[in-house]
Amino acid sequence: MLRLRNCGIEIINCADTKPGAVLYFFCAEKVDITPAADMAVAMIYPYEWNSMMTPWKSAGNNGTGDGDVFAEEMVKNIIPVIEEQLGFEQGIRGVGGYSLGGLEALYMSTRYRIFDFVGSVSGSMWYENALEYFENNRMNVKHAFISLGKREAKTNNPMRKSVLENTVKIVEKTKEYADTVFLMENGGHFTDIRGRIERCKLDFNSFCK
């Protein structure tokens, strides 16, 4: 694993040749992803998850709100390091993430025009002001993949109960300007994390063909 000052990086690439596409994916814990032909996956493991994966501060939640700083670091420093290592010069880029990582990925796609694909896997669309933000800020992508567990809204936490309603509204908004896949998965937030990420990867792979 490549370790930078603010995140660990694991690159999954099945070929010695230069990949034609790269998917950058944010995750809190290490997940073993299957290599896929003609593409690479760069698993990004931020050291300060709650801080780096939240684009703005949430009232009452200390240690949040550095996602914009991390996004800039990704674009200016982290992505160039990875692409130099891969020999990736031109092709398709995607950004995705799990949980708060999904929130950060969608946010990055609104701030920068370097991604063709965005993926949110069990994304934290319950986060304060997330719905309002994505209803008013367009994602600069051609294709979006958004998934959520069927039981994720079944919680006693009043804020997190909104995750399904908010996600559906964001999906409908995204469909207005990008090809969008919305997948309801079995289980709750922590069910089959690897499988859910794999399905996002497969959708990215299909988009690239």
For each feature predicted by the language model, list its residue ranges.
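The conserved beta1-alpha1 loop
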Residues: Y24-A28, S122, L148
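Short beta-strand immediately N-terminal to the catalytic nucleophile in serine-hydrolase-like folds
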Residues: G94-G97, V121
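Gly/Ala-rich beta-loop-alpha elbow adjacent to hydrolase catalytic centers
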Residues: G96-G101, A105
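The feature captures the conserved acid-bearing segment of alpha/beta-hydrolase catalytic domains
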Residues: M125-N205
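A conserved short beta-strand
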Residues: I114-W126
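Serine-hydrolase catalytic machinery in alpha/beta-hydrolase-like enzymes
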Residues: G8-E10, T17-G87
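Short, hydrophobic alpha-helix immediately C-terminal to the catalytic nucleophile
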Residues: L4, L106-T110
